[in-house]
C-alpha cells in the first residue's frame, strides 16, 4: 500500500488524518497520550484494529510521560493513562484488548528499572502493529477462497488498511482475491453519516486499482434485486460468543437485504474482535455520537436547526444473517458458539 495508517517513529505516533481524506493526505504527529486519546475520539484514526494499535501506542507514549520515583507511583499513573484510553470509544473491543495486553506487559516487567518498562511497552505496541498487519494478510488469504471469479462484492463502511495497521479485514479479503488474479469489482456503500465508504473505501481501492463503484446506502437493495451483487463482505467492531456482530450503523440493514435475496454475507475480523464474555449481542455497548454528524456535512448544515437527532454509530447483526465469519485462523460457518470458541483458543 502507498500509505501508512499508523506507526511509531522517533518516539512519536504518526497517523494519517482520516478526517481529511480523500481531499488531503495529511499525517499527524503525536507525542502526548492525551492527544492520541483525542485522535481516537475524534476519528482521526478509526476502525477497531487500528484503534487497538493507536491505544497501545498511546499507552506507550503515556509511560514515557510519567514522572515517578517509585514503581508504585509509576504503575498508579500508568493505570490512569489506560483509563483515559479506555474512555475514548466504547464499542470496539480491540481497544480494550490492546490496553489489557499493554497492562500485562507492564506487570511482567515490574521490578525492573522504569526505563526498561517504558522500552518494553514501546516494543509491545510496535509488536501489536506488526502482528495486526500479518493477521490481516491471513484473514485475506482465508477469505479470498470464498470469493468467486467475476464477483461483485458489496462492502459497508471501511474495513481496509485505514481501519487496521495495513491491508484490512474486509478489504483484505478483497485485496487477496484481486492479488490472486480473480476478476472482481466492488460496490461501496457511502455509509452515512460519516461517509467512510465514500471517503475512505473508494480512496483505498482506487489507489490499488481495484474496480469500485460508489452507491448511496439506500441503493443496496435495488442492486441486489437486479442480481448485480454476488456477496457482501464487512468488518466488525465486536463479535459476541454466538456470532452476533456489532459493526458500523447500517450493516444490519445490508445483512437483512442479503438474506432476503439469497446473497452470502461475510464478516471478516481478527480473533481479538471476539468478546466471548458476551453470550449474544444484546449487551454490546453502542456508541452515540454527536448530532452534528447527521445534521451537517463538512461543516455545512443540511437539516433544520434544533431538529431532534439520534446518531448510534453501530448496530448489531444477529448471527442468523451471517453466512460465515472469517478470522486469521480460519472460517466459522454457522455453529458460531462452538467454532468461535475453538478459533479463540488457537
Swiss-Prot record:
Substrate binds at residues 46-48, 89, 196, 247-248. Pathway: Amino-acid biosynthesis; L-methionine biosynthesis via salvage pathway; L-methionine from S-methyl-5-thio-alpha-D-ribose 1-phosphate: step 1/6. It catalyses: 5-(methylsulfanyl)-alpha-D-ribose 1-phosphate = 5-(methylsulfanyl)-D-ribulose 1-phosphate. It holds the Pfam family IF-2B. The active site is at 237 (proton donor). Belongs to the eIF-2B alpha/beta/delta subunits family. MtnA subfamily. This is Methylthioribose-1-phosphate isomerase.
Amino acid at each position: 500500500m502507498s500509505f501508512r495508517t499508523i506507526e511509531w517513529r522517533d518516539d512519536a505516533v504518526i497517523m494519517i488524518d482520516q478526517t481529511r481524506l480523500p481531499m488531503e493526505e495529511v499525517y499527524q504527529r503525536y507525542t502526548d497520550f492525551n492527544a492520541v486519546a483525542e485522535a481516537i475520539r475524534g476519528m482521526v484514526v478509526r476502525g477497531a484494529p487500528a484503534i487497538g494499535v493507536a491505544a497501545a501506542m498511546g499507552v506507550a507514549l503515556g509511560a514515557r510521560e510519567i514522572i515517578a520515583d517509585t514503581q508504585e507511583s509509576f504503575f498508579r499513573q500508568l493505570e490512569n493513562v489506560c483509563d483515559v484510553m479506555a474512555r475514548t470509544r466504547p464499542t470496539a473491543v480491540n481497544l480494550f484488548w490492546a490496553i489489557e495486553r499493554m497492562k500485562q506487559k507492564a506487570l511482567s516487567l515490574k521490578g525492573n528499572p522504569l526505563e526498561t518498562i517504558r522500552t518494553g511497552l514501546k516494543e509491545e505496541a510496535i509488536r501489536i502493529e506488526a502482528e495486526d498487519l500479518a493477521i490481516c494478510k491471513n484473514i485475506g488469504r482465508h477469505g479470498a477462497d470464498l470469493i468467486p471469479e467475476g464477483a461483485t462484492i458489496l462492502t459497508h463502511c471501511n474495513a481496509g488498511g485505514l481501519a487496521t495497521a495495513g491491508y484490512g479485514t474486509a478489504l483484505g479479503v478483497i485485496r487477496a482475491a484481486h492479488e490472486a488474479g480473480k476478476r472482481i469489482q466492488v460496490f461501496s456503500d457511502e455509509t452515512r453519516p460519516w461517509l467512510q465508504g465514500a471517503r475512505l473505501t473508494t480512496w483505498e481501492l482506487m489507489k490499488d486499482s481495484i474496480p469500485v463503484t460508489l452507491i448511496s446506502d439506500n441503493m443496496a437493495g435495488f442492486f441486489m434485486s437486479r442480481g448485480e451483487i454476488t456477496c457482501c463482505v464487512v468488518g466488525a467492531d465486536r463479535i459476541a460468543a454466538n456470532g452476533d456482530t456489532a459493526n458500523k450503523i447500517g450493516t444490519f440493514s445490508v445483512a437483512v437485504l442479503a438474506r432476503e435475496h439469497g446473497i452470502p454475507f461475510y464478516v471478516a475480523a481478527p480473533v481479538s474482535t471476539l468478546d466471548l464474555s458476551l453470550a449474544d449481542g444484546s449487551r454490546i455497548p453502542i456508541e452515540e455520537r454527536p448530532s452534528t454528524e447527521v445534521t451537517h456535512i463538512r461543516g455545512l448544515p443540511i437539516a433544520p436547526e434544533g431538529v431532534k437527532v439520534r446518531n448510534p454509530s453501530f448496530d448489531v447483526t444477529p448471527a442468523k444473517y451471517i453466512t460465515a465469519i472469517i478470522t486469521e485462523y480460519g472460517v466459522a460457518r454457522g455453529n458460531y458458539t462452538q467454532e468461535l470458541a475453538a478459533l479463540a483458543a488457537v
